[in-house]
Amino acid sequence: MPVKKEAIFKAISEIKQKSKKRNFKQSVELILTLRDINLKKPENRINELVELPYAPVEDVRITVFATGDLALRARDTDVYKVLGRDALITLANNKKNSKRLVNETDFFLAETTLMALIGRSLGPILGPRGKMPTPIPPTAPIETIINRHQKLVRVKVRNQLVTQCRVGTEDMADALLVDNIQAIFTRFEQRLPKGFKNIRSAYIKTSMGPSSKIEL
């Protein structure tokens, strides 16, 4: 790993010292500035989900579209909502409620048999936001899939050579934050044309606090 753990620990310590107390739990965000990448080439743009070692927040909101046994098993977990076919049809006729659901939900999972209906009813809202559901077979281990999605973050590089994503919260142990940050670095190394050489700089910050540079 090109980035030493000590450098990440140092930056985390600095932002926690600099950050003022707020009346809410601040997130910790990683900001990467890239270089020498031609974003006019579609293959160089990034829009994907990265699985972190630890959930970056406690309240990841997951909505599941399912019927039958899959819906029953989903309701036994701590997902945000479980909606069936009738609810989907109702949402299709109410754009206001559809937009509210999409804005309130971090990730969507959907039984494979409902994907076509979802595409017709919610696709125009989900698609532009990058929130199209992950298809789930009716017999899939929904609990395992939900646990995995609670650890996911979306990273995007589209029009500018910079990306920002949440890697945890200010009350997380430093060691957990370090592991999550390293997971992002590892994925970008794999994904960028020249690997780590395409990363110009890295910073971390809390939601409302100043940033601190990670020495690369």
Where are these predicted regions, by residue range?
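Flexible glycine-/small-residue-rich
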Residues: 66, 167-169, 206-208, 216
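A structural signal for small-residue-enriched, beta-sheet-centric alpha/beta enzyme cores
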Residues: 160, 164, 207-212
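Residue-level signature of catalytic and energy-coupling elements of molecular machines
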Residues: 11, 74, 127, 204
